[in-house]
Each structure stands twice: as C-alpha cells, then as structure tokens.
C-alpha cells in the first residue's frame, strides 16, 4: 500500500508512484466534489491502467449529498462509477460490462469474482461513502477491497532471487 500526497504541489512524486500500483483508492471530499486535480489524477490512473476504488470522504459534514456526488462522479469521471451501497447495485453493475449483463440476465445475481474482474479491467469503479475521521463506513470500504480485488499474478522474473554469500 502506498499513501501518496493528494496536493497539486506533489503531482510529480505522486505520478511516479502510480506506475507501480496494482490498485488505487481515490479519495474525494464530499464537500468539494470532483476538482481539477481530481480529473488530473483520474487521467493518470487511466493512463497507467490502474484499477480504482473511490472513497467519498467527509460525509459527516453538513450539507453533503451522496446522490449529488455520485451523479458528479458519473458525469465527470466515468459511467462505471457505481455506488456499492445502492439498492440497485446489480442492475447498475450490469450496465457497465457485457459479461456482467449476461450473468445478471441469466441468474439475477453477480458473483464477487466477476465484479472483481470488471474492476480489474477498469469497467467498474466501486464508490464507497463515509468519514475517515470518524471511521464511519471505512470498514465497508475495507470489505469492498477484500471482496473485489483480484490477486495479481507476476512473472517469475519479477522477483529478485535470494543470493547468499559464503557466510550464509
């Protein structure tokens, strides 16, 4: 896990880390919504093909509106941004991917493995809402990460062999 600075002054440092990520969690303020820097990060995540989860933070602040933020995420970032607390979750997911639509039409449900595959292919961007400061619904985000992330398979030559000297 890497925690990169979100401030625009650290863009160069942050961009270097994106090249090695398996997944990203893009944190967006519910009070500020999608900002210019958010769009820049989104383009970079797309460029480096990084599957992305979204956590909309500060939902405990007065005047925040999850439906409004969700509509903004869909219009500004991607139609694949899906609120994973939605009552219509399967229907929304089915609209993001042909394999998900086929599975939903056949069984009326979707498996975690198929959802995880759509996330890994950047067809679906799971959105979770909460307050990091108050630990409100952070557990839901963690459960979502656990359920909807595919284990990455790396080639054997990715790892450095262990080399021992004469002393062991």
Can you annotate each of these PLM segments?
Residues 1-168:
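Structural and coupling elements of P-loop NTPases
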